[in-house]
C-alpha cells in the first residue's frame, strides 16, 4: 500500500535525506585514483554514525557494507573491497541513511580523474534523465509519466535503460510501494498525490540494456561489458513543485 506522509513524518524524512545527501557528497569527493572502494565504505559508515543515523544498506537482506560502489561496467550493488580506483574509471555510489524511523536514499556516478568524453556524456545523460522525469513528479500526474520521460531522454541520446531494477517508494521502509520503472508509456499507474515519497533512480547502460548477475549475489554488470551510470534522489510530491529530500547540489557532474 502506498503511504502518504504527514507533516511530521516529512520533517523526519528531510532529516534522513539531508544526512544521506551529505554522505553521497563525501563519497563523491573520495572518488580519486588510488582510493579503494573499502575506504569509501568505511568513511561513509563513520559519517552516517557520527550524525546519529544508521546506514540503511548495512545487513539489508544480508548486504555486507554501508554503501554500494559500482565501477565502470558494474551497474549497481557493487560490494566495496580491495579494488583500487584507477584514472579513467567511472564510479557509482549508492547511499542510504536511517534516522528517526525513516530512510533516505540517493546515488550518483562520478569520474575518477580524467575520463573519456563518452563516459562523461553517459554520466550527464543519466543525471539529466532524472530531471526530465522530475518534471512529472507532480500531484495529479501518473507514475508512468516519470518513467516515460526518463526512457525517452535516455534513448534519444543513444543509451539504454535497465529494466530489471527500478526506483521505489520510501519511508519507514527502504523499499515501499510503488515501484518506479525507468521505462514505460505515459498515463499509467497510480496518480501521484501530495505526501508521497519516492526514489527515482535511472540506471543507464552505454550499450545494451542486458545485464548479468555476478556470483557474489549482489553485483549487477552490463552484459556487453560497456559502462553504466546511476543517479538517484528521494522526492516528496507536493501541491506544487516536487521537493528533493536528498539535496542534489553536490551530486552533479
Please report, for each region that a protein language model flagged, where it lies by residue.
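Active-site neighborhoods and metal-handling regions in enzymes and metal-associated proteins
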Residues: 1-253
